[in-house]
Regions:
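A cross-family phosphate/adenosyl-ligand binding-site feature
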Residues: 1-119, 124-398
Length: 398
């Protein structure tokens, strides 16, 4: 994912320094080249040898080390670095970076870097909340740093509050968002619907479907990584939503319709990937229905057609994409849906095809527009999401 990218991982002298080893390992698994620079205080918490074994590269600590491969090591490293991540960052290092102090290998190197910079402060709650620290972080933001807020919880000193270094998995997501994708959706707003709706029969039971939300969340994550501001309206899902997107939770088709009406107008791209019930109980029971002998009939009524409403109420320039899950006559039914709903593209799925459908991590999609039909091969839902976004961008440029 990050092959060919050079990440400078700065590690400073806090108890959370041990988490930097897990982050370093995760970065190596993305095929990034990881260069670790430590402060001398950091070496009191974790040995440079740990990072050297993980990365295969020399861990830099001493500005005046005479064993450098390059004559001016901090400048050479700064030139080839694609992204800086300092995690954990002490209050001391935050202050030095905010005011341009360069008195060790880490601050000297980072001062020379012209690439994107991320910093994850970790410290005692009192130090974090100190106005001086907050002023320093605001200065860093002013100069283009992305400041990753600490988590709250029990700290090593025994206090409870803000100051914990976020888990390495979340820090990695920040790095991937900054580096992995072209930012061709920067400045755009994307709305995605995902998951299944649940239509109540009574306070206990409901009608739903097999949608996991994986395809919708893959679209949301891909759009986020490509620079978009993303909102996800989701029903029931079996997986967690991606980070850095706004999540709006709903249950029923009626709730999803109202949420779409509220949030769709501002979107540049709308992807309706949710599996929304076509019918809902006409009158859900107020109390739990009791089991009786014989058959049970439940009157149903049509739900609002969200995609048709979007097609009829779209604003000029908005790109609208729907999904079609079929078991027969896939192309014919999907082409008819494209025309009937007034959308730009239908992503058609054949439920009978191996590797496609609900709950799996792959998909086989046919992209249908007014101009052409494009059959995508079996691929991960993440890859399919990017293929859909590529096509949507072409449609936006028409």
């Amino acid at each position: 994912m990050l092959k060919g990218k050079v990440v400078l991982l700065g590690v400073t002298g806090g108890i959370a320094a041990y988490k930097a080893a897990s982050l370093c390992s995760a970065l190596v698994k993305t095929n990034a080249t990881v260069e670790v620079v430590m402060t001398k205080n950091a070496t009191e918490f974790i040995a440079p040898l740990t990072f050297e074994q993980l990365t295969g590269n020399k861990c830099l600590v001493d500005t005046f080390d005479r064993n450098f491969v390059h004559q001016v090591e901090h400048i050479s490293l700064a030139r080839r670095t694609d992204l800086v991540m300092i995690a954990p960052a002490t209050a001391n290092v935050c202050a030095k970076l905010a005011h341009g102090l360069a008195d060790d290998m880490l601050t000297t190197t980072v001062l020379a870097c012209k690439c994107p910079k991320l910093i994850a402060p970790a410290m005692n709650t009192g130090m974090w909340e100190n106005p001086v620290t907050q002023d320093n972080l605001q200065t860093l933001r002013h100069y283009g740093w992305e400041v990753i807020a600490p988590d709250s919880g029990r700290l090593a000193c025994g206090d409870v509050g803000a100051g914990k270094l976020p888990e390495p998995e979340l820090l990695l997501e920040h790095i991937i968002r900054a580096l992995a994708m072209p930012k061709d959706l920067a400045g755009k707003q994307v709305l995605v619907t995902a998951g299944a709706t649940c239509e109540a029969l009574d306070p206990v039971r409901f009608i739903t479907n097999h949608s996991s939300g994986k395809m919708g969340f893959a679209l949301a994550k891909a759009a986020m990584l490509r620079g978009a501001e993303v909102k996800v309206i989701c029903g029931s899902t079996t997986v967690a939503p991606p980070p850095f997107v706004e999540v709006i939770k709903v249950q029923s088709a009626a709730q999803m319709f109202e949420a779409v009406r509220e949030h769709s107008r501002e979107a540049d791209f709308v992807f309706k990937a949710a599996a929304v019930a076509d019918y809902t109980p006409a009158e859900p029971a107020a109390e739990k229905m009791k089991k009786k002998d014989g058959a049970l009939s439940i009157p149903l009524k049509r739900t609002e057609d969200i995609l048709a409403w979007l097609g009829a109420n779209r604003r000029p320039g908005q790109v609208l994409c729907g999904f079609s899950m079929e078991t027969e006559n896939v192309l014919e039914n999907s082409k008819e849906k494209l025309k009937k709903k007034g959308v730009d593209m239908i992503c058609a799925n054949d439920l009978r095809q191996a590797g496609a459908g609900f709950g799996v991590d792959t998909n086989v999609i046919t992209l249908i527009t007014a101009e052409d039909v494009r059959q995508l091969p079996l691929m991960s839902k993440e890859a399919a999401a990017n293929a859909i976004l590529d096509r949507a961008l072409i449609l936006a440029g028409k």
